[in-house]
């Protein structure tokens, strides 16, 4: 049985800090505790070690990422730009 219906992981804060702040924190905490896909071994075992440090539990690789999410939107944009430039350079 579920203990909470809507508060989820931020139930630990109880009535403190205000509803909208707790809602924001809920999104962050869910993403930071989630398991992500490892680019090296392909398994869903990349977990947050510290702010911006992500470690794969399977292959023990450590990668830098976002503070709360493994890959940031800025990093994705840069990666796409680099790939596009590399393809243009090769052809």
From Swiss-Prot:
Give GO cellular component annotations, separated by semicolons. Answer: ribonucleoprotein complex; ribosome
A Pfam match is Ribosomal_L37ae
Q: Give the GO terms filed under biological process for this record.
A: translation
What are the residue ranges of zinc fingers typed C4-type? 38-59
Q: What does the UniProt keyword field contain? A: Metal-binding, Ribonucleoprotein, Ribosomal protein, Zinc, Zinc-finger
Q: Which GO terms describe its molecular function?
A: structural constituent of ribosome; zinc ion binding
So which domain of life are we looking at? Answer: Eukaryota
Show the InterPro entries listed in the entry: Ribosomal_eL37/eL43, Ribosomal_eL43, Ribosomal_protein_eL43, Ribosomal_zn-bd
| Keyword Ribonucleoprotein carried by entry | yes
What HAMAP family does this protein map onto?
Ribosomal_eL43
Q: Which NCBIfam families match?
A: eL43_euk_arch, PRK03976.1
By sequence similarity, the record places it as follows:
Belongs to the eukaryotic ribosomal protein eL43 family.
- The protein, known as: Large ribosomal subunit protein eL43
